[in-house]
């Protein structure tokens, strides 16, 4: 087409005419530099002949500064008049396809590289998508226009250009280096066939990743579930158990399937894209996306399961929007049945949501239908999204993973592992969450209300506020097969029956949940709200003067940059001053001026709200805060002392906050933090020991503020131990200890003026007690009562002296003693009665 000057003139004219209507964009600009050697010749591989595709690719190459496909290129002595070829040859005049031969250009390139050891050629697979439709067979109209798995004719392509040309996307992939393939010394013919095979597999996987796998209509999928052995058996058992006919049980199963299944509709996806583009840029200050290129690399050829943290109802919409905008198929999303509300439920279902009940208990037929539906999605390669936390986090911290969906995923993979599964953690960070005021009420003890359509209007009423920016970070992928290889090396040899439940499933699922939570926290997006919250909530009066606040924020930024939490963690740009101005602009910081300057403070309402944003990043500050705590009671400590107490307390912090480092890496990380402290003047290293600054110094004030980030967490730990020790051996059950801890924490929060309702969160005490049991610190007797090691008191007191002030320890012991006396009085009264 572009071999002669005349044809190039015609091509240029056609391209200009095409772009009177067409608008195109490249999906992944970052891939342009991925292993691309600009000194080596570049060829572009297109899947099938299309002058419109070539015109779009040529335009995108010009925009990106890449070599153009329509210009000549040299490989040694070989001069090719154009730098592109079609993997599938053009049909002959009778429309017949020649599937035997390789593209002539590719044949000549392979020969040139084979014959000249110093030469190389880079082949970039490139695809053009006219529209991006994830539902393949639900509409004849969309099948006619959007890219699909059907062969596209000239008339269909013309209509596609007219209808979808303004939403055209180009995907450039990493180049294939011919020198590497030729270097395998397999001969010309085999190298040629190997190159063709690589390109064919690449195009097939890429198409699946971008426009979605080939899928039947929703009705066909739901009806197909009823013919699966697992569901058929459940129908028979349901009929016997409920004393109904099998036909009636089958109808019940069908109704469950219709209740569950999504109804992906492309028009809704496009509608949401338009609406949400306005929303993110009108309500929020846009979206900052990090590390999505890792998803684009791993998605082809994998069943992708997105596992985001859950902070807001708009999480459902946000991830689908971002994936669609970045050329990836929006996932099928697990949503609670409570969201299947009038109007909203239908919209969510057409946007990819499938609905699940909060509990499957007592309904084996529903369980079978739901399990089989998920299995169908997995084996067909549909991207899926679910929240391992179960519900939205009201406290801002990562919730303990709910393992139900993970267990279903694991069992499905054990049944059929042909499609490799990869989990993609997605951290979603809001500078201001839409439901913030609702969470504020719930944190203060208000009963959690059931969602309704009217909640939307409450949120809309708050939209006049400034909400800042949204950050979305994609974390390190977790490949399920590799995870299982580490946990259960013989998993491939075990039976594949749908009912198979290996003994190790529960424990392995629990560890998978922990791994996902850790990877989510690794991808945290630290924002100005988080840092200001950490700083002000560490003060006694929730206030700092303007200059001191700037110094604290500058210190935190410096420390976090010196000791990065993980490669996937992101930090805000700018310095402490810019962070202060940013948060002030969101009306969350109050300001008071006097003759000495400005004081920044939090009012009572915002102080509680800011605990949410502090908790988002508490896992990042936990270890440096713990190290700083050691120097509140001790003026000097050796490295060995620091490591000993850190190792003693770290497992409990790690378990609660899902901190990333295993115990065998802890010493190195502690050394990095100590070095950073010394660099910033927070500590001095003198005579084989670390020495704190003078108590009257500015550096000691900074060290003290840093130590308070996890002070309440450490107090809760000490509180539980104190109550247990006061009660004695084999006296309390875990549930009784949990209740006592909650009451004691409420009392202490009043006595010490702690305005943080999560301080007496029952679930945190429950998890700490379970961690003590898991680590063998506590044991349960036959009656379910707790016993502990005789040295527990001495060890706990020794650690507490290092991290908690004497007055706090004394107050906790006194309240614990008083609580124990009250418990004994209640027991005596009940016995007398």
From Swiss-Prot:
InterPro entries: GPAT/DHAPAT, GPAT/DHAPAT_C, GPAT/DHAPAT_LPLAT, GPAT_PlsB, Plipid/glycerol_acylTrfase. GO terms for biological process: CDP-diacylglycerol biosynthetic process; fatty acid metabolic process. The keyword Cell membrane applies. A motif (HXXXXD motif) lies at residues 309-314. It is found in: Cell inner membrane. The keyword Magnesium does not apply. It is a peripheral membrane protein. Its EC number is 2.3.1.15. SMART domains: PlsC. GO terms for molecular function: glycerol-3-phosphate O-acyltransferase activity. Keywords: Acyltransferase, Cell inner membrane, Cell membrane, Lipid biosynthesis, Lipid metabolism, Membrane, Phospholipid biosynthesis, Phospholipid metabolism, Transferase. It catalyses: sn-glycerol 3-phosphate + an acyl-CoA = a 1-acyl-sn-glycero-3-phosphate + CoA. Disulfide bonds: none annotated. Pathway: Phospholipid metabolism; CDP-diacylglycerol biosynthesis; CDP-diacylglycerol from sn-glycerol 3-phosphate: step 1/3. It comes from the Bacteria. The HXXXXD motif is essential for acyltransferase activity and may constitute the binding site for the phosphate moiety of the glycerol-3-phosphate. Belongs to the GPAT/DAPAT family. This is Glycerol-3-phosphate acyltransferase. It comes from Pseudomonas syringae pv. syringae (strain B728a). The lineage of its organism: Bacteria, Pseudomonadati, Pseudomonadota, Gammaproteobacteria, Pseudomonadales.
């Amino acid at each position: 087409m572009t071999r002669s000057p005349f044809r190039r003139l015609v091509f240029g004219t056609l391209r200009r005419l095409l772009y009177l209507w067409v608008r195109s964009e490249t999906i992944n600009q970052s891939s342009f530099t991925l292993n691309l050697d600009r000194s080596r010749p570049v060829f572009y591989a297109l899947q099938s002949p299309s002058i419109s595709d070539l015109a779009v690719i040529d335009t995108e190459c010009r925009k990106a500064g890449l070599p153009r496909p329509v210009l000549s290129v040299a490989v040694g002595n070989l001069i090719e008049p154009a730098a592109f070829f079609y993997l599938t040859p053009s049909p002959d005049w009778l429309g017949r396809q020649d599937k035997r031969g390789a593209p002539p250009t590719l044949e000549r390139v392979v020969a040139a590289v084979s014959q000249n050891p110093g030469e190389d050629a880079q082949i970039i697979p490139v695809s053009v998508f006219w529209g991006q439709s994830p539902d393949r067979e639900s509409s004849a109209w969309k099948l006619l226009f959007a890219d699909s798995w059907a062969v596209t004719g000239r008339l269909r392509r013309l209509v596609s250009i007219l209808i979808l040309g303004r939403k055209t996307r180009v995907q450039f992939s990493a180049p294939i280096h011919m020198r590497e393939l030729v270097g395998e010394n397999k001969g010309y013919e085999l190298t040629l066939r190997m190159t063709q095979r690589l390109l064919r597999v690449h195009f097939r996987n890429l198409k699946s990743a971008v426009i979605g796998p080939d899928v039947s209509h929703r009705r066909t999928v739901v009806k197909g579930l009823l013919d699966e052995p697992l569901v058929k058996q459940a129908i028979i058992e349901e009929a016997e158990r409920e004393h109904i006919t099998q036909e009636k049980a089958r109808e019940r199963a069908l109704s469950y399937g219709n209740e569950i299944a999504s109804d992906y509709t492309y028009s809704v996806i496009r509608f949401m894209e338009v609406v949400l583009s306005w929303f993110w840029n009108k309500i929020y200050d846009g979206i900052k996306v990090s590390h999505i290129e890792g998803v684009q690399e791993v998605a082809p050829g994998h069943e992708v399961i997105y596992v985001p943290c859950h902070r807001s109802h708009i999480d459902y919409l946000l991830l689908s929007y971002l994936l669609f905008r970045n050329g990836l198929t929006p996932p099928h999303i697990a949503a609670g049945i409570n969201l299947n509300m009038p109007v909203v439920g239908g919209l969510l279902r057409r946007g990819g949501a499938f609905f699940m009940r909060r509990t499957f208990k007592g309904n084996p037929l529903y369980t079978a239908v739901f399990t089989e539906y998920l299995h169908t999605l997995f084996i067909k390669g549909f991207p899926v999204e679910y929240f391992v936390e179960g519900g939205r986090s009201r406290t801002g911290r990562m919730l303990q993973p709910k393992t139900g969906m993970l267990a279903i995923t694991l069992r499905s993979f054990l049944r059929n592992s042909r499609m490799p599964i990869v989990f993609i953690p997605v951290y979603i960070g809001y500078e201001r969450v839409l439901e913030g005021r609702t969470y504020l009420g719930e944190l203060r003890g208000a009963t959690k209300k059931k969602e309704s359509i009217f909640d939307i209007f409450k949120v809309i009423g708050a939209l006049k506020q400034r909400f800042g920016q949204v950050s979305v970070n994609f974390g390190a992928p977790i490949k399920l097969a590799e995870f299982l290889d580490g946990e259960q090396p013989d998993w491939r040899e075990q039976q594949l029956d749908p009912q198979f439940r290996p003994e190790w499933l529960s424990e392995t699922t629990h560890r998978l949940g922990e791994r996902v939570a850790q990877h989510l926290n690794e991808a945290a997006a630290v924002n100005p709200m988080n840092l200001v919250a950490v700083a002000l909530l560490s003060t006694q009066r929730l206030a700092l003067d303007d200059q001191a606040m700037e110094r604290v924020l500058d210190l935190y930024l410096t420390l976090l940059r010196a000791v990065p939490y993980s490669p996937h963690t992101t930090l805000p740009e700018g310095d402490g001053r810019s962070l202060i101005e940013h948060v002030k602009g969101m009306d969350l910081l109050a300001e008071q001026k006097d003759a000495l300057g400005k004081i920044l403070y939090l009012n009572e309402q915002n102080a509680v709200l800011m605990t949410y944003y502090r908790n988002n990043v508490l896992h990042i500050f936990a270890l440096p805060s713990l190290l700083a705590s050691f120097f509140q009671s001790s003026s000097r400590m050796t490295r060995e002392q620091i490591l000993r107490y850190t190792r003693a307390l770290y497992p409990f912090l790690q378990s609660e906050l899902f901190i990333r480092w295993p115990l065998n890496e802890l010493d190195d990380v502690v050394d990095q933090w100590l070095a950073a402290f010394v660099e910033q003047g927070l500590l001095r290293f003198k005579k084989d020991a670390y020495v704190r600054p003078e108590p009257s110094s500015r550096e000691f004030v900074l060290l003290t503020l840093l130590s308070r980030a996890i002070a309440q967490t450490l107090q809760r730990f000490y509180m539980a131990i104190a109550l247990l020790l006061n009660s004695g051996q084999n006296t309390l059950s875990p549930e009784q200890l949990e209740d006592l801890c909650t009451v004691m924490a409420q009392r202490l929060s009043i006595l010490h003026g702690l305005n943080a309702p999560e301080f007496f969160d029952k679930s945190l005490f429950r998890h700490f007690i379970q961690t003590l049991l898991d680590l063998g610190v506590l044991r349960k007797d036959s009656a379910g009562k707790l016993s502990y090691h005789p040295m527990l008191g001495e060890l706990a007191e020794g650690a507490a002296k290092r991290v908690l002030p004497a007055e706090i320890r004394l107050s906790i012991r006194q309240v614990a003693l008083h609580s124990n006396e009250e418990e004994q009085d209640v027991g005596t009264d009940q016995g007398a009665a």
